[in-house]
Curated annotation (Swiss-Prot):
This is Uncharacterized protein MJ1680. It comes from Methanocaldococcus jannaschii (strain ATCC 43067 / DSM 2661 / JAL-1 / JCM 10045 / NBRC 100440). It holds the Pfam family PIN_3. SUPFAM superfamilies: PIN domain-like. It comes from the Archaea.
Length: 155
């Protein structure tokens, strides 16, 4: 009899969650990044999300917190290697900040949870923390909400 593989939760983490995880690895965003690197959850991303993360991480403002360029590039490469990179066919325009639409596009295509601390994305969700687009309900928790639910899920 074949062994059943555990279903892994699919997530899309926004740029701020990634950066917060690097600045404070022991914080809640750090726990989320650990879950991704330990392959306990599956991160979905896109070339445009990776480009934004790289651009922000390599900015002079953040390099003083994150270390030298070589270290940052190694982390970004490792993150890319444990993520599923897709090129979404959808192009929603529902966010006040147009740059945030790329997270919705990836989550919609991959049926993933968007983990975010971004006020614009959070403002789009209903009282149950879902964003409804074309009859698809995308869960949009904050990092804290996600960790609380994940810990209940695995216990």
């Amino acid at each position: 009899m074949e062994k059943m593989e555990k279903i892994k939760i699919k997530v899309v983490i926004d740029t701020n969650v990634f950066i917060s995880a690097l600045i404070n690895p022991n914080g809640i965003p750090g726990k989320i990044l650990d879950l991704i690197f330990e392959e306990k959850i599956v991160n979905y991303t896109s070339p445009s999300i990776l480009k934004e993360i790289g651009f922000k991480c390599l900015s002079p403002k953040l390099r003083k917190y994150l270390g030298n360029e070589n270290r940052i590039l190694k982390i970004l490469t490792a993150f890319s290697s444990v993520s599923v990179i897709i090129n979404p066919n959808t192009n929603f325009n529902v966010c006040r900040d147009e740059d945030d639409n790329k997270f919705i596009n990836v989550a919609y295509e991959s049926k993933a949870i968007i983990i975010t601390g971004d006020k614009d994305l959070i403002s789009l969700r209903d009282e149950n923390k879902y964003l409804k687009i074309n009859n698809i309900h995308l869960k949009v928790p904050t990092p804290k909400e996600f960790i609380e639910e994940f810990e209940k899920f695995i216990s």
